[in-house]
């Protein structure tokens, strides 16, 4: 009887070891771990054009945005470059909204200053709330630049956040 008990104990031990090992390996998903890590870093990017403005506008202007988002402190640091706008941008900003949908402004409009032209660069630091960070990670934030000719937006581009 003692031999049978030892055999059952050994089988249960091996089964438990295999089960827990399998559970540990299947629970690890690096991509989701990075998205949910409270100190994860993300690379921000996005291309803007007049066709993405809702409703679309006529123009050959484009813009690109590049930067980082730090989920530890909520800071998104970006640099926006634009070219061929109808004139100098008078304002810009970040908005919550899916592609093709107008959304609400987050934070303040960018204070772009004076002396700008139809081609230029602007850098910004914005602190996101947890709701805005979730929208960023799911592709539901966009940026827009407005000009005197198109005060509701001349170019618009969705933001993409890629875990580093």
Locations of regions flagged by a protein language model:
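Divalent metal-coordination and catalytic microenvironments
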Residues: 65, 92-95, 143-145
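Short proline/glycine- and polar residue-rich coil/turn motifs
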Residues: 112-121
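Acidic glycine-/aspartate-rich tracts in secreted/extracellular proteins
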Residues: 84-86, 97-101, 148-150
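Bacterial Sec-dependent N-terminal signal peptides
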Residues: 2-5, 18-45
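Transition segment at domain starts
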Residues: 34-72
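Short, well-ordered beta-strand segments enriched in hydrophobic/aromatic residues
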Residues: 75-84
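Short, exposed beta-strand-loop hairpins at the edges of beta-sheets
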Residues: 133-158
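Extracellular C-terminal loop/segment signatures of secreted glycoproteins
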Residues: 102-112
């Amino acid at each position: 009887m003692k031999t049978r008990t030892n055999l059952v104990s050994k089988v249960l031990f091996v089964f438990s070891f295999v089960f827990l090992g399998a559970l540990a390996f299947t629970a690890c998903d690096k991509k989701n771990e990075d998205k949910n890590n409270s100190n994860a870093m993300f690379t921000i990017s996005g291309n803007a054009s007049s066709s993405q403005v809702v409703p679309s506008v006529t123009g050959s202007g484009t813009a690109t945005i590049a930067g980082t988002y730090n989920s530890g402190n909520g800071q998104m640091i970006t640099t926006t470059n634009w070219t061929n706008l109808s004139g100098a941008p008078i304002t810009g900003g970040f908005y919550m909204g899916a592609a093709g949908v107008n959304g609400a402004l987050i934070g303040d409009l960018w204070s772009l200053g004076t002396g700008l032209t139809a081609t230029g660069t602007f850098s910004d630091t914005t602190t996101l709330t947890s709701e805005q960070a979730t929208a960023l990670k799911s592709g539901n934030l966009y940026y827009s630049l407005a000009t005197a000719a198109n005060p509701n937006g001349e170019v618009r581009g969705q933001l993409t956040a890629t875990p580093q």
